[in-house]
């Protein structure tokens, strides 16, 4: 049976996984009375085996889920807490029987912004139910065609349900259907191939296991080393051309996600693409993880031969959008997939809101947001560049992690908190220099790192967690403004330029140390390196001017409007030392 009945919405979202469900909820929370449809071939009560890469959140993704989507209580009650990231390198690759056989960068305290591990099947099942309760309409079917008309013309999505075919129309279409690439294929919007992805050429094998004996990993007793759990962190293990994750995704069933990202030119697909080969790889190279695997019950095994891809356009002038795996992914390292989703979700909501309201600058926002999101995804691509050569070198990789953490906590996290990624004026100034750093300083650091790996240089283990590595008790997730303490959570209340000023300065110090320890005086005095050092200091100075300007322009604004309103109201407070009667109510 077929029907040509037309069903109309403001936004149709193809795909009801993490990206699509977060997008739907964010739209409904921020645009009153918006009509949203979700389409997915998976049933509402999807099974617990409906799992995929991406179970660990970092700060920006956690802020999206907990703050922007209002799900903090839900996360506390339903998903494991995350105690930061740990990094492990074998002391001797031939001896990896226990965690003591590794060098470590342990997280030693709870980071300031809470993060979580996610059981994706449960999260998506629960969030779909919440979205339906908020008014979203769910179609359990498969998209068979989408007519992407130009501009503001209505788009039509043809959906095959169980016993009928329907057509759904909307002005805005979001592809969150993952690797089906519904829009990507139709518009030739996808970019594959390591030659166009900064050399990233990786695959992934992973298992879900339950009833794990976690004491094989760690006893949980480390009183002199940490104030947080080692097990409930995301643990990373490294070796030549690969890294592994170990993520607890369910407390009751003691379930773990355990997987590897491997680079094909070091570890060919044919050597690791089955459960047996993956198990043998663990036994030979990370025996402690093999023992953990043997202690458990297998839930499932997966292999993905090609991880990395990106899109040419993320937000089209023709009112279509790609988000999540439908848009891009490069690697699971640093768990940045959900971060790219978070920034894209908020960008899409603001574009849709502006266009539905017929705001004059709606198209300008779309263009600026598209440029920034492409630049941000390119930065994630850049963070994965040259991994195949550097992952297994404990010294060089630890310095690299420190370097990348500095940008994350010093610039990107405060940018998200202050909603600067939604400020077109700021983005126009930021995106160009951001790309300059990606194509200049980052490339130089990674090329120098390759030289140091080839020479077998030991520069020491750079600990991204501790405050004794640079000058002035600096540590990477230190923030330089009181945006958390004084809840500067409204748009542009936190001063992004403060974070940028300090980050540029400390990166300059890191860069000088890196050159000195790696190359000596020749490294310090090399003209290219002097230029990079000078440019960092110049950007720090320019950011200081931006900091002063922003402080001046916002001098009359309170840090937080709700707190200011309460303080004004409190001026009328008078103590009343009298209880209200209650016994009479009982009688």
Tell me the role of every PLM-derived stretch.
Residues 14, 175, 322:
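Redox-cofactor binding/interface segments in oxidoreductases and associated redox assembly factors
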Residues 46, 130-287, 345:
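Predominantly flavin-linked oxidoreductase catalytic cores and closely associated redox partners
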Residues 46-95:
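N-terminal FAD cofactor-binding segment of flavoenzymes
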Residues 352-587:
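C-terminal helical "tail/cap" subdomain of flavin- and related membrane-associated enzymes
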């Amino acid at each position: 049976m077929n029907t040509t009945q037309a069903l109309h919405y403001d936004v149709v979202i193809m795909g009801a996984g993490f990206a699509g469900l977060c997008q739907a909820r964010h739209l409904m929370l921020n645009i009153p009375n918006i009509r949203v449809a979700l389409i997915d071939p998976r049933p509402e009560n999807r099974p617990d085996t409906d799992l995929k890469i991406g179970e660990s959140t970092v700060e920006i993704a956690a802020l999206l889920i907990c703050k922007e989507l209002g799900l903090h209580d839900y996360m506390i009650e339903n998903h494991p807490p995350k105690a930061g990231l740990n990094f492990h390198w074998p002391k001797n690759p031939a001896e990896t029987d226990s965690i003591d056989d590794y060098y470590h960068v342990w997280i030693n305290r709870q980071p300031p912004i809470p993060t979580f591990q996610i059981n994706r099947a449960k999260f998506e099942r629960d969030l779909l139910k919440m979205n339906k309760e908020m008014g979203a309409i769910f179609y359990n079917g498969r998209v068979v065609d989408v007519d992407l008309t130009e501009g503001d013309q209505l788009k039509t999505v043809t959906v095959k349900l169980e016993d009928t075919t329907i057509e759904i129309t909307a002005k805005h279409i979001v592809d969150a259907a993952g690797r089906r690439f519904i829009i990507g294929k139709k518009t030739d919007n996808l970019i594959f191939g390591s030659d166009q992805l900064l050399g990233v050429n990786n695959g992934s094998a992973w298992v879900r296991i339950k009833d794990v004996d976690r004491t094989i990993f760690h006893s949980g007793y480390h009183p002199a080393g940490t104030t947080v759990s080692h097990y409930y962190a995301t643990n990373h293990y490294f070796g030549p051309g690969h890294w592994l994750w170990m993520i607890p995704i369910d407390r009751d069933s003691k379930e773990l996600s355990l997987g590897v990202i491997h680079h094909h030119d070091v570890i060919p697909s044919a050597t690791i693409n089955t459960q047996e080969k993956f198990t043998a790889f663990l036994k030979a190279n990370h025996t402690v993880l093999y023992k953990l695997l043997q202690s458990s019950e297998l839930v499932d095994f997966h292999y993905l031969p090609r991880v990395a891809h990106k899109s040419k356009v993320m937000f089209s002038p023709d009112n279509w959008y790609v988000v999540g795996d439908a848009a891009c992914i490069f690697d699971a390292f640093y768990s940045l997939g959900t971060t790219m989703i978070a920034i894209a979700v908020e960008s899409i909501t603001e574009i849709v809101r502006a266009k539905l309201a017929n705001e004059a600058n709606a198209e300008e926002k779309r263009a600026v947001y598209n440029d920034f999101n492409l630049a941000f995804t390119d930065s994630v691509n850049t963070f994965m560049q040259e991994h195949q050569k550097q992952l297994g070198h404990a010294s060089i990789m630890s310095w690299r992690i420190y370097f990348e953490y500095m940008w994350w906590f010093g610039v990107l996290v405060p940018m998200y908190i202050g909603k600067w990624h939604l400020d077109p004026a700021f983005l126009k100034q930021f995106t160009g220099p951001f790309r300059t750093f990606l194509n200049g300083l980052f490339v130089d650091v990674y090329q120098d790192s390759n030289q140091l790996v080839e020479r077998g240089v030991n520069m020491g283990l750079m600990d991204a967690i501790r405050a004794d590595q640079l000058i002035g008790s600096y540590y990477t997730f230190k923030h330089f403004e009181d945006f958390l303490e004084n809840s500067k959570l409204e748009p542009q209340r936190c001063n992004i330029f403060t974070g940028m000023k300090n980050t540029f300065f400390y990166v300059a110090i890191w860069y000088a140390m890196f050159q000195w320890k790696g190359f000596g005086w020749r490294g310090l005095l090399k003209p290219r390196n002097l230029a990079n050092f000078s440019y960092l200091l110049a950007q720090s100075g320019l950011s200081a001017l931006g900091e002063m300007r922003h402080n001046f322009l916002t001098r009359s604004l309170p840090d937080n409007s709700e707190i200011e309103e309460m303080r004004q109201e409190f001026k009328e407070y008078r103590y009343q030392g009298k209880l209200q009667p209650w016994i009479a109510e009982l009688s």
